[in-house]
């Protein structure tokens, strides 16, 4: 597994249980997990991972609102060049993405307690 694949899996993991925003949750959680692996992650890597997940049908983007309609599915990857001031754009896993997430990832770096597996390593390509 290379760095890009790892970031994609970590991002997918973050959007499997709820709609999540890049700047509110995804970036912070993935950066925290990546640090356990000895990596510093940039926000742009998260955005790239989300674009790839959407392109491959593993995730979708939504606009969420406290007013009807409460959620609006967006087509494709929205531009997220800057941090959102009002946190309107969220991401959620698709059925295909959930199937991937639930599959047995031998390359997932963490054990069931969230600790880095001693046999895990990142491929340098």
Task: Give residue ranges: language-model regions.
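Residue-level marker of positions within ordered structural domains that often coincide
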Residues: 16, 58, 102
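Short amphipathic alpha-helical interface segments
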Residues: 1-44, 48, 55, 87
């Amino acid at each position: 597994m290379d760095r890009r694949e790892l970031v994609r899996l970590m991002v997918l993991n973050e959007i499997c249980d709820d709609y999540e925003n890049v700047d509110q949750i995804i970036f912070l959680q993935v950066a925290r997990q990546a640090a356990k692996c000895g990596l510093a992650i940039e926000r742009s890597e998260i955005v790239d991972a989300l674009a790839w997940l959407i392109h491959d049908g593993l995730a979708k983007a939504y606009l969420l609102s406290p007013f009807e309609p409460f959620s609006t599915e967006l087509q494709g990857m929205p531009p997220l060049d800057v941090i959102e001031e009002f946190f309107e754009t969220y991401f959620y896993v698709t059925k295909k993405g959930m199937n991937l997430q639930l599959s047995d990832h031998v390359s997932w770096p963490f054990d069931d307690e969230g600790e880095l597996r001693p046999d895990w390593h990142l491929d340098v390509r």
